[in-house]
Design a protein with these regions (language model features):
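Soluble non-cytosolic domains of exported or imported proteins
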Residues: 277-285
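Short, surface-exposed beta-strand segments enriched in small/polar/acidic residues
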Residues: 265-275, 287-309
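Beta-strand signatures of extracellular beta-sandwich domains
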Residues: 190-194, 226, 305-307
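Short, solvent-exposed loop/turn segments in extracellular or other extracytoplasmic domains
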Residues: 206-212
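A short, solvent-exposed beta-strand micro-motif common in secreted/extracellular proteins
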Residues: 219-231
Length: 309
């Protein structure tokens, strides 16, 4: 079918499930998978677990969310918001309105076991019946969920505007296309993003010829974005987000230089402070960019000529 790739198997290390049911939710960048499973080491019946994408493309051994979230009952139908911190799930292990109620909680650190107290989303969502599969849009404005409240048996889909207390943290969508710098035509490329303050992989996505790319930034600050594609030199750039106030979108297009002999690659000026031999702060970023460029290309393109223009 046009617009879809062929299905690929997903490997989760040491995966096991004693229940006939399981549910999964993957973050927008594919780096985090939240799931509902029943295991012999769990807190009760179905528990919530988290797994992280590994370098080999598999997901890590599932880690239990801990007793702040998981009870002796069933915790199921998890949904991780775009902020990567707010989790929505259904449970029959907490006091509530009926059979299976919908709750939300926020992650307090990177342990994935330290959470705020689960908040019941109230009678506008929860009923004496089965209320499950709560999900929200990236803006954090509209929620969708399933409920059997109409007839007590079959599930219907409902939507509701999120109340302030149920909203996730603000995020920013970074969107755009990657193109060939010579032809200006869009190309398929990979984008990896890291925070400058904590140089670990923050997100990964693909840019396609037809739809471009989209990345979610969950906090303000400086980010290093590396764009790569077969047959092209790596583009390494830094962007800075001063603040996040509500949901926002930024369009940022990138271009890659094709690997062709004789091409001239222009670098920005390396500047010094006035009447000083000390480099301007902005110059260090450009020097680092040149070093990363040379490291990424030197192995298969050993000959460079640098000269002022």
């Amino acid at each position: 079918m046009d617009g879809w790739t062929l299905p690929q198997p997903v490997k989760i290390n040491n995966f096991s499930n004693l229940n006939q049911y399981n549910e999964f939710c993957i973050s927008g960048d594919g780096g985090i998978m939240v799931m509902s499973l029943e295991t012999s080491a769990g807190k009760g019946l179905l528990d919530l677990y988290v797994s992280f994408l590994q370098a080999d493309g598999s997901y890590s051994t599932p880690k239990n969310f801990g007793s702040a979230i998981n009870t002796a009952g069933n915790e199921m139908t998890p949904f991780l918001a775009a902020d990567g911190k707010t989790i929505y799930f259904s449970s029959n292990g907490f006091p509530g309105y009926g059979n299976q109620d919908i709750f939300m909680a926020k992650r307090l650190d990177n342990s994935w076991t330290n959470w705020t107290e689960p908040l019941n989303l109230g009678s506008e969502v929860n009923t004496p019946e089965w209320d499950v599969y709560y999900s929200i849009d990236a803006k954090g404005e509209i929620a969708y969920f399933s409920s059997s409240k109409t007839n007590g048996t079959n599930l219907d889909i409902f939507s509701i505007k999120l109340p302030p207390q149920a909203k996730p943290e603000d995020v920013l969508w970074l969107k755009g296309v990657v193109s060939d710098r010579i032809t200006s035509l869009p190309i398929n490329a990979d984008l990896t993003i890291k925070t400058i303050s904590e140089p670990i992989n923050f997100g990964f996505t693909n840019s396609s010829i037809s739809s471009g790319y989209a990345l979610i930034l969950q906090q303000f600050g400086s980010y290093q974005i590396q764009i790569s594609a077969d047959g092209y030199y790596v583009n390494d750039t830094v962007i800075t987000i001063d603040s996040l106030i509500g949901f926002d979108e930024i369009i940022k297009n990138f271009s890659l230089i094709p690997r062709k002999e004789g091409l001239i690659i222009e670098m920005k000026n390396i500047l010094f402070k006035v009447n000083s031999s000390v480099l301007e702060d902005s110059s260090f970023q450009e020097i680092d960019k040149i070093v990363r460029f040379m490291k990424s290309t030197f192995s298969d393109t050993p000959h460079f000529l640098f000269q002022p223009i």
